[in-house]
Amino acid sequence: MNLKNLETCKGLIKGSYIDQAIQGTSQFNKLLETLLIHKKLPNIGYNDKIIELILNEISLMDSNNFIENIGVGEREGRIYSGLVEKRHYGFAHGIGRSGDITEQQPKAAGSSLIQKLTHSLVLDAMKLAGLEQSSLSNCLLLPMATGMTLALTMLTLKSINANNKRYVLWPRIDQKSCLKSIITAGLIPIVIPNQLDGDMIRTDLVAIEDKIKELGVDNILCVFSTTSCFAPRVPDKIIEISEICKRYNIGHIINNAYGLQCSKILHNISQACKLGRVDAFIQSTDKNFMVPVGGAIISGPNSEFIDQISRNYPGRANSSPILDVFITLLSMGKQGWLNLLKERKELLIYFNEQLSKFALENNEKLLNTINENKISFALTLSSNNFNNNEEIISNNNNNNNNTFSMIGSKLFSRSCSGSRVIDLKSNKKLLIGGLEFNNYGSHIDNYSTSYLTVACAIGITKLEIDTFIQRLSKLFNKK
């Protein structure tokens, strides 16, 4: 209710009561004013009531919510179901226009405002997480998950380069959507095998440079590197890769899917942008901001390239993933976001200690990757630990499966999600996009041992870690 209407209410009830009400509504208006002026995360997150008030106020700016509006066009933001309308807070027009995903819509000032504010909040959150300003000239939040966003990024890079640049040099990462994003963009993936460094699987920089010389600079569009990954693979050497790309004038796209929560990765991205060439780095919204799957953020030091990606997106887009991030960041606030990052870092140390203790008690080994991989762990698997486990042996015989693969299914049946078993005894081969991979899932052809991977990702709790260790212990020691 605006001030004029509140003053009118003084003719209906006591003026002193209305003065109190004016004070209360002024507090809300001040919060909204601060958000609109500063466009940053509030220091303390807003409660759900305040966020809903903000959403309802802004949605009234869209034409489909005008009281006297009539629509005679083909796309008028009509919503049949009341549940659907409630779910979207009345936002029906999506984001962007046919020529640009970030262009403002005449019919949807509210939706356009939400998009603009969300981009500003995301930039603020990324800086708070540890990215330097020089690496963040702009960002683009798209309603597509990471794989499709990577494909659009490479398509855009391809559109501004000569057509003969067909090859993408890709240090092997056994995640299907990464490879498929290259193929979807109509490009040819050139797999760069990794190399072993102790327990770690690492980037082979010499192999990258040799392949550049072999194929020719004029034929290579970019190097497609990866930061966040499952141990024992560790993040690619993106600083050195960026320097190679700068030296040869080759594009560099970084898949930073869930790396936004890791300060070491963000420091390396900032350094790569400063010392070499980085065209864009892409991160997932669900893995970093704890929202439903469906969004990804494109960032980079070159604002013009990010704008070009925006212009290349065909048509309008769904605004739900943008709205999810907007609500979540307002709910977290600056302190909530920083606390989540801090807690994850502390629990990483605790998880490492508990896994090390477990490994010692069960004659296994926690692979030594923590100095480079600050999110994921890998624990060796030895058949000796399961020779007397009647449940696993029985299931293994009945299903004709390998013992190690049964461990993963048994963990899942005990409500432990997210762990992965890499069984190297099976010599698993997989064909993707015409390329055959040996021991798929391990990121390398010849790793020495089977293992179990887990992750210490943002939002994990100490209780989850303790419960996982307990359930894993029962599986190892069940007679």
Curated annotation (Swiss-Prot):
Residue numbers binding tRNA: 414
Originating organism: Dictyostelium discoideum (Social amoeba)
A Pfam family annotated for this UniProt entry: SepSecS
Annotated metabolic or biological route of this protein: Aminoacyl-tRNA biosynthesis; selenocysteinyl-tRNA(Sec) biosynthesis; selenocysteinyl-tRNA(Sec) from L-seryl-tRNA(Sec) (archaeal/eukaryal route): step 2/2
Catalytic activity: O-phospho-L-seryl-tRNA(Sec) + selenophosphate + H2O = L-selenocysteinyl-tRNA(Sec) + 2 phosphate
PANTHER family membership: O-PHOSPHOSERYL-TRNA(SEC) SELENIUM TRANSFERASE, SOLUBLE LIVER ANTIGEN/LIVER PANCREAS ANTIGEN
Sequence intervals crossing the membrane: none
Stated family: Belongs to the SepSecS family.
Positions of substrate binding: 97-98, 105, 316
Protein name from the UniProt record: O-phosphoseryl-tRNA(Sec) selenium transferase
Subunit and interaction comment: Homotetramer formed by a catalytic dimer and a non-catalytic dimer serving as a binding platform that orients tRNASec for catalysis. Each tetramer binds the CCA ends of two tRNAs which point to the active sites of the catalytic dimer.
Disulfide cross-links: none
Gene3D superfamilies: Type I PLP-dependent aspartate aminotransferase-like (Major domain)
InterPro entries assigned: PyrdxlP-dep_Trfase, PyrdxlP-dep_Trfase_major, Sec-tRNA_Se_transferase, SepSecS/SepCysS
Site location (May act as a substrate filter by repelling compounds with a negatively charged alpha-carboxylate): 74
